[in-house]
Amino acid sequence: MSVKIRLKRMGAKKKPFYRIVVADSRCPRDGKFIEEIGYYNPLVEEKTVKVDSEKVQQWIKNGAKPTDTVDRLFKNNGVYEAK
């Protein structure tokens, strides 16, 4: 089972916000997930990212891979250092 840290789209049409979740890579984008570890709201003037960094570090240590978008969000918000 390959585990990814990715975005799950929520909200209404043309007004999205995203939950940052840990999910099996074979599950659909908005389908079943293992754990919710934060959220991202791109629509407010100052984009909001709230993440439980301890859970992120734990999942990465256990082998979860963040998607490119989530990786960029984490680096821009200081969840972990750029390599």
Curated annotation (Swiss-Prot):
One of its GO terms (cellular component) is small ribosomal subunit. The keyword ATP-binding does not apply. Keywords: Ribonucleoprotein, Ribosomal protein. Pfam families: Ribosomal_S16 (PF00886). InterPro entries: Ribosomal_bS16 (IPR000307), Ribosomal_bS16_CS (IPR020592), Ribosomal_bS16_dom_sf (IPR023803). One of its GO terms (biological process) is translation. GO terms for molecular function: structural constituent of ribosome. NCBIfam families: S16. Belongs to the bacterial ribosomal protein bS16 family. HAMAP family: Ribosomal_bS16. This is Small ribosomal subunit protein bS16. The gene is rpsP.
